[in-house]
Swiss-Prot record:
One of its GO terms (molecular function) is translation elongation factor activity. SUPFAM superfamilies: Nucleic acid-binding proteins, Translation proteins SH3-like domain. Disulfide bonds: none annotated. Pfam families: EFP, EFP_N, Elong-fact-P_C. Gene3D superfamilies: 2.30.30.30, Nucleic acid-binding proteins. Belongs to the elongation factor P family. It comes from Stenotrophomonas maltophilia (strain R551-3). InterPro entries: Elong-fact-P_C, NA-bd_OB-fold, Rib_uL2_dom2, Transl_elong_fac_P/YeiP, Transl_elong_KOW-like, Transl_elong_p-like_YeiP, Transl_elong_P/YeiP_cen, Transl_elong_P/YeiP_CS. GO terms for cellular component: cytoplasm. This is Elongation factor P-like protein. The lineage of its organism: Bacteria, Pseudomonadati, Pseudomonadota, Gammaproteobacteria, Lysobacterales. One of its GO terms (biological process) is peptide biosynthetic process.
Amino acid sequence: MKANDIKKGNVVEFNNGVYQIRDIERSSPQGRGGNVRFRFIMYSVPGGNKLDASFDADDNLVEVELLRRQSTYSYKDGDAFVFLDDEDYTPYTLDADVIGDDAGYITDGLTGIYVQVIDEQPVAIQLPASVVLEVIETPPELKGGTATKRPKPAKLNTGIEIMVPEYIVNGERVLVNTATGEFAGRAD
């Protein structure tokens, strides 16, 4: 596939790795005979490591077929996470090092997860935009003192810590943005 045919979201092979294209910048410099160049911002699958690479319009890249299977988190088997396909209940097992920091957002029975599969092998997951987690430890609200909002740290039931508004108390369920790791509102 030529570089000028590649779109955002395509998965390609490059430098003995597999990468998903997240952003494309097109430039056509006037001084070099008008050769169009493409700069791809891509992330490794699995791993999510960022890579910037530039290509001429007629450079060839090998496209890789990546399937996204909607799944539900089922259980943890040692250091591995097991997800079940929502359609045919195929189990997908991914090691904790592949899941990485996303493990802090995974709770029993979490739905809306997409397992990314290449050649029938699970390689990565894509979490839902937000998840509901429970606050298990946060300091009490300080009365008076200031009219400004002050965030405070809160430890959640999966072990991660986020900053929450002062009015959030222990035992409360909160929405957490999985892309930024920030408080996104009260659940329920």
